[in-house]
Amino acid sequence: MICGYYQYILTRRLFKLFFILCQILGPSMLKPSILLSTVILLCINTVLFGQSKGINREKYRISTKETNNIISVDGILDEPAWLTADIATHFQRVLPTDTGFASAQTEVRVIYDESTIYVGIVCWDSTPGKRPVESLRRDFNFLKNDNFIVFLDTYNDQTNGFAFGVSAAGAQWDGVQANGGTVNLDWDIKWRSVVKNYKDRWVAEFAIPLRSIRYNGGSKE
């Protein structure tokens, strides 16, 4: 398994997001004025909320964009909003060593409208071959499947969050994390995701309804 992380700061929307990528080789409505402060990209078997220390955040700043166009959740990132969105990439490897970039790179885009957060992911393969699929069930073991998971730190406390993910085979994974503990996978909501597989990569598209998550009232960050 090769794992890595990268940290980005996204401006203009919502709350902190934590992304997890694991690639195995060979009750309130959110308001548009709330600031989206930080995105951390990870590929590791825990959420690692404390990884921000010592990182130059300004170096990894990207902006989310609001769209008024209809986004078709089909696993094909061809709408104008996707084509012009900032891209988070260049993951830093942390397992088995933390001495360089991950050999399998990932591209992440985030856009939103009044009701939904959209996440677009392109996961490139570093070696050819069949992608590991241990299960097609919901809430699969993410250490045994190629997958991508996003954590929404809606309370901006690096301790609590909502998780949404998919495997390369298209299975969904979602849950709630409280007080920095393990993720409770009994929490399931209706959200949309589609995965497309290609010879050298797999692509995923998420649509996460804002009504399904909560945040601190009056939060500005």
Per-region residue spans from a language model:
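Bacterial Sec-dependent N-terminal signal peptides
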Residues: 5-56
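Structural preference for beta-rich elements and adjacent junctions enriched in aromatics
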Residues: 50-221
